[in-house]
Amino acid sequence: MDQEGGGDGQKAPSFQWRNYKLIVDPALDPALRRPSQKVYRYDGVHFSVSDSKYTPVEDLQDPRCHVRSKARDFSLPVPKFKLDEFYIGQIPLKEVTFARLNDNVRETFLKDMCRKYGEVEEVEILLHPRTRKHLGLARVLFTSTRGAKETVKNLHLTSVMGNIIHAQLDIKGQQRMKYYELIVNGSYTPQTVPTGGKALSEKFQGSGAAAETTEARRRSSSDTAAYPAGTTVGGTPGNGTPCSQDTNFSSSRQDTPSSFGQFTPQSSQGTPYTSRGSTPYSQDSAYSSSTTSTSFKPRRSENSYQDSFSRRHFSTSSAPATTATATSATAAATAASSSSSSSSSSSSSSSSSSSASQFRGSDSSYPAYYESWNRYQRHTSYPPRRATREDPSGASFAENTAERFPPSYTSYLAPEPNRSTDQDYRPPASEAPPPEPPEPGGGGGGSGGGGGGGGGGGGGAPSPEREEARTPPRPASPARSGSPAPETTNESVPFAQHSSLDSRIEMLLKEQRSKFSFLASDTEEEEENSSAGPGARDAGAEVPSGAGHGPCTPPPAPANFEDVAPTGSGEPGAARESPKANGQNQASPCSSGEDMEISDDDRGGSPPPAPTPPQQPPPPPPPPPPPPPPYLASLPLGYPPHQPAYLLPPRPDGPPPPEYPPPPPPPPPHIYDFVNSLELMDRLGAQWGGMPMSFQMQTQMLTRLHQLRQGKGLTAASAGPPGGAFGEAFLPFPPPQEAAYGLPYALYTQGQEGRGSYSREAYHLPLPMAAEPLPSSSVSGEEARLPHREEAEIAESKVLPSAGTVGRVLATLVQEMKSIMQRDLNRKMVENVAFGAFDQWWESKEEKAKPFQNAAKQQAKEEDKEKMKLKEPGMLSLVDWAKSGGITGIEAFAFGSGLRGALRLPSFKVKRKEPSEISEASEEKRPRPSTPAEEDEDDPEREKEAGEPGRPGTKPPKRDEERGKTQGKHRKSFTLDSEGEEASQESSSEKDEDDDDEDEEDEEQEEAVDATKKEAEASDGEDEDSDSSSQCSLYADSDGENGSTSDSESGSSSSSSSSSSSSSSSSSSESSSEEEEQSAVIPSASPPREVPEPLPAPDEKPETDGLVDSPVMPLSEKETLPTQPAGPAEEPPPSVPQPPAEPPAGPPDAAPRLDERPSSPIPLLPPPKKRRKTVSFSAAEEAPVPEPSTAAPLQAKSSGPVSRKVPRVVERTIRNLPLDHASLVKSWPEEVARGGRNRAGGRVRSTEEEEATESGTEVDLAVLADLALTPARRGLATLPTGDDSEATETSDEAERPSPLLSHILLEHNYALAIKPPPTTPAPRPLEPAPALAALFSSPADEVLEAPEVVVAEAEEPKQQLQQQHPEQEGEEEEEDEEEESESSESSSSSSSDEEGAIRRRSLRSHTRRRRPPLPPPPPPPPSFEPRSEFEQMTILYDIWNSGLDLEDMSYLRLTYERLLQQTSGADWLNDTHWVQHTITNLSTPKRKRRPQDGPREHQTGSARSEGYYPISKKEKDKYLDVCPVSARQLEGGDTQGTNRVLSERRSEQRRLLSAIGTSAIMDSDLLKLNQLKFRKKKLRFGRSRIHEWGLFAMEPIAADEMVIEYVGQNIRQMVADMREKRYVQEGIGSSYLFRVDHDTIIDATKCGNLARFINHCCTPNCYAKVITIESQKKIVIYSKQPIGVDEEITYDYKFPLEDNKIPCLCGTESCRGSLN
């Protein structure tokens, strides 16, 4: 050891050590107390200093061992599977492609934008390969499919950085690559790249060679890569569509129809877009059904379209081998039949080796035929589809199909040996036995279960679509949510078809809710035509073949059953329409021609009424089908599925399909067809003005609906799957019961299929309904029975190998012809409507311009009008029109039911007047705002719920009547061979004109009446009336529903329903004439109807009264159609009241009306009626009057005049309560919305009707029966416009408004003077609350309005009033006669109608003279129109929404007490007691607005029309306080202190001056600066009395003191001129430029101080002085005189004199009047 180491005598320890360490070194640490003392430590324990204070190291350890070092966490993320080209299985929808992004969107922004919807894994923005420019494309990969779907749902078509972006789910970025190539190739810019299918697919169609090259390049990664282009590749089961992936329709799951464009690097092709499917079916089973995605339901049309479309991968864009042919059929087939993508559809399913090129659609007819075939097959698809639902696993699919399909079928489904990847993971399905005759399940050929798949392979392998059909419909399938994403890429790339004019027109028409309901959409035509083209959607995929599964068998392409099947499952055409381009909702079975785009709300809210099949008498069926399967029996009938867009005819080479027996008339519709809350809400949205429904209300209503359904026995036969995967809750529109008879026979004879599977399947089968009109279809009766045709074809094609080719050619020809015809028809209709509308408008204007015609002319005109009407049988016109080329002849209309789908012309106006509104308008002598067209369009659907046409006991919707009528009219204009009917367009237009003339007549007659009362008003009213009439006339033709229908139909309604009550002014006069004419016309007009209505006897009083009272009665047309007991017209009924079951008879003179129809129901289907204008006549039109004697209606006639003078105590009923939510709920929505006036205004309910309604439901059944039958006798042409159920009460009631009623109406008639009421009636006690039975009316009553609830004193019966004033009766009658004659004279209608008018007047006077003055018979017992079940329930359960009010409480208690008194089975009630519930629905009265609450109200009620009113100074002074409180407080404050300071400053200034001593110094800058410093004053600005703002002193200012400096920018003259111009342009009206000298100006406009607020005054209290400080000129304001606190500072601007004077506003005595 080194001796120095110890240092300084330090001794080393005596022991041997191995290590030592110098612990302390004094040289390094001089602060140590012990100098030069080194301390060593040996071996970590011993120290060289004995008394060392250091501690030894206790735990010795190897320094090389890092025990104490911290372990660092190492994250090893779980590796994620990469979905490369070898991936097999469902590709999760985690990848979202964004297009059309703003080029400022970068990864971080996009990631943040998407992060809110789910965890983002990768974000990539595509840049141009060379320029690195932003391409507007981005890829976002989410960790979950939910995030991706939510992103697409929320971001698609939203604006991001100013761009409407396109987001879609994109499997493996195939669409993104298409966009990328389109942009990089220069074909499109990032903002114009087509995200819609047609342009995109066409862009990629390319030539075959190009397709091959690009495909070879692209497909290297796909499972078909192993095969040369053009060879058939064994369809990998994994492929939803084995067809070449590049085909537009490959993987049906892609968002865009052309999911695999020709240039798409389609590597994932092996897996169809199955991920969408919620069902786990394996990919190989090709179950990439669109239904799969559970996240949200695709829109019906999209889904159906995309599924059928994407499934039918018929794109020809792919390489020859995999052309579209292979695609569609094989697509589905490959899954199960594993036939190669190209071969399966083209070659027989069994031989997948045959190449697809064989049928590749080389001949254009092939694709077109395919299209039609697909459409057809989609409808005829059979239950086998269910297999997938029940057994989704792909592996077992073959076995399933073996069970379900006939052996022949399954043999085709058997997996092919050459399946590429399929064999790896899927055991081949057992080979099926050799083909046997197809079983029902197998259906015919491809149409059979699997074949039904959209492209569902040649054998009917469950195509993705097929499978989808099997999957239960989900209430919210992705597509329906509207997000493009899950709905298969089809939607994400909406087709460019929309850019075509036809398609856009079609979409516009769709928005109008199918005015042309029978027209096939142009999109379909376009698709059919283009299907042969490169982008043919359905092109070569399915090759029709006669053989059941022969090489040519086109697999049916069912519409997306997820959406369609459930809804339209019962329709013959359910999915028959060609798949629509994306975005164009394919008319699901629920949609009719133009109706195709029925959105969810429409779907829920307005399904078209079920067609009434019985009207088409089909020939007897060769094999009569068995009764409908139980599943059909259990289906709710309320919603007839929408009619398919159009049905393609079966291939001509097949034998004619067997006919089906006419289905029985459908049972009455029931509201309990809302199978789930979504449906209910949808319907409610349309029906009840979008009223909010709480969860409890929905629940209770649905429960009640279910109970009602069961109670009605509708579910009695529900042997279907009880609440199965597709319980009724999933069926938006289950097929109507009659649909069962339309089913193909195969469906009935389900072999082993078993009823359960059958019924479930059938839910989603489009059930062909032979009788369905198929409005937009060009299908004839036999075509409606395609399933049989298909089987026949299959059988025949086995015999004739060329049958398939022939069929395709013929189908193509037929299709082209149809499309041409449809286009021509569309054009013709549009032209007719447009020209007709113009003619009507012209006529109405001419009429308006004419002076009143003399009576002779008017009579002549009326006679002409009658002749015209006699000439026009509405039904025949329809028939003739159909014969002459109306879409497919009468079969398409199925007579009555076809009318629903028949010519519904679009409305060319924004608003349309409803007939009742028109009448009211004429009543009130001012046109009423008409209801928006949209509402009218909703009406038919809304009404459907109340009454389906053809359902016993229900009224056909008014729209139907209108349509029937207008169809008669408009069709007539196109008829080529009229055959007993006028073919000329004139007849229709003339009739319309006549109708309008009638309107005008009526209105003018009313005006004449008014003139007698008040000429000034009459003249006013006339103008307005003629306006309204002109509107009517215009509308009459333009939309074929309103003007003419309102008149002619109301007239027609009155024809059978004595028009008196139709005193709805518009139809009053015309109704009378029309009655006479139309009643005569009816027998001829409606051949189907067997009950002729003889011309009413001339002595008919009804019209007379209607006319007389019409001026004062805006009654809804519904009254015009009282239910008349249909006795022979000749028998005058006894004048005694009839039993309640029938409307009380009127006096003999009215008898013909009453007894026109036999009271017993006639087995004719009632033609559709028009919607009710308002719920009932009682509802909106009259204030309820307590029960008068039975003769009340008659009294109304005879004493009508008297009643006007009787003071009217208006009962407070639900009807005339304020228009709040409860009243809305308690009435039909049309009452408020459509009627054009709110319920509060419609307080005119006749006594008779009120009482009749009150009397309960005993009358209702008979009334209903009559009501349902009434239209049957009434020829379609003469259907009433608004025949409301109230009309059913008595023809007399309807015929003549009650006198009291007329008085009430007079009160609400703003054009007529009100006669003073002579007496006050005695109040009557309240009516008893309706019994419980009334609350839940029977189904038959559902069309009728609910009984009114009287909530206040009623007035005494009319009878008493009339007895009190019998003497007035005669006077009033005479007055009426005078009024009538005057009105008829004053009517300004064309000469053609005048004759009719004379005749009518003579008839009226005749009947009047003969009318006995005897007291009328006692009034009929009160009868109320019962509420429909739906309305009843809505009112009942509205307490969940609006709360419980006192009235509800009282009725609940009353009901409770009555139930307690009943001994029937409610023992549990005895254990309950009534507990008062808190009233939760308290109406808070509106605070009355005080006049000073704000600016005055606008005179017109619209600020937009008037802008702001200028506020006068007087008005300003009311609230403008010039002196704020602070200033006033200063006034009283101590101003002495300030004055003292001022005087001190002045004195200091004087001392300073005297010290300087020279006067020259007075001008020095120093002094001036001093002044500026010391002389600033306290000022404020405020509102000035002179002009705008002003400057006010806040302290007293002495004379000659500086007040303020004018501060601003020093600018030159030139700059000032420029600024002044700019300020004027910017709208800065005031000038703040102050000139200092000739070249310097101070601009205080933008920067300055308070001095700029100083106003000009001709006698100012200040002056401006320019001083120079530090060589800078300043403007200083000095006081001229002492200025007090709050006095405004003013000075004279001294503007130079100019010609253009600026007015001075100072208002002083010496004001010069101008500033310059």
UniProtKB/Swiss-Prot annotation:
Segments of skewed composition (Low complexity): 222-231, 278-295, 315-357, 477-487, 1028-1071
Enzyme Commission number(s): 2.1.1.364
Biased composition range(s): Basic and acidic residues: 859-869
Pfam families, per the entry: N-SET, RRM_1, SET
Gene3D superfamilies per record: 3.30.70.330, SET domain (2.170.270.10)
Residue ranges annotated for the SET domain, each copy included: 1577-1694
Region ranges (Disordered): 194-367, 380-499, 516-670, 849-869, 911-1206, 1230-1259, 1275-1297, 1355-1427, 1480-1508
Places the protein is found: Nucleus; Nucleus speckle; Chromosome; Cytoplasm
Segments of this protein annotated with the region Interaction with WDR82: 60-89
Bias (Pro residues): 430-440, 606-631, 638-670, 1130-1150, 1413-1424
Motif RxxxRR motif, chain ranges: 1546-1551
Regions of compositional bias (Acidic residues) in chain numbering: 991-1009, 1018-1027, 1283-1292, 1369-1383
Reactions this protein catalyses: L-lysyl(4)-[histone H3] + S-adenosyl-L-methionine = N(6)-methyl-L-lysyl(4)-[histone H3] + S-adenosyl-L-homocysteine + H(+); N(6)-methyl-L-lysyl(4)-[histone H3] + S-adenosyl-L-methionine = N(6),N(6)-dimethyl-L-lysyl(4)-[histone H3] + S-adenosyl-L-homocysteine + H(+); N(6),N(6)-dimethyl-L-lysyl(4)-[histone H3] + S-adenosyl-L-methionine = N(6),N(6),N(6)-trimethyl-L-lysyl(4)-[histone H3] + S-adenosyl-L-homocysteine + H(+)
Region described as Interaction with ASH2L, RBBP5 and WDR5: spans on this chain: 1459-1546
Biased composition (Gly residues): 441-461
Enzyme class, UniProt record, top EC level: transferase
Alphabetized PANTHER family for the sequence: HISTONE-LYSINE N-METHYLTRANSFERASE SETD1, HISTONE-LYSINE N-METHYLTRANSFERASE SETD1A
Described function: Histone methyltransferase that catalyzes methyl group transfer from S-adenosyl-L-methionine to the epsilon-amino group of 'Lys-4' of histone H3 (H3K4) via a non-processive mechanism. Part of chromatin remodeling machinery, forms H3K4me1, H3K4me2 and H3K4me3 methylation marks at active chromatin sites where transcription and DNA repair take place. Responsible for H3K4me3 enriched promoters and transcriptional programming of inner mass stem cells and neuron progenitors during embryogenesis. Required for H3K4me1 mark at stalled replication forks.
Family in the record: Belongs to the class V-like SAM-binding methyltransferase superfamily.
Name of the protein: Histone-lysine N-methyltransferase SETD1A
Gene source species: Mus musculus
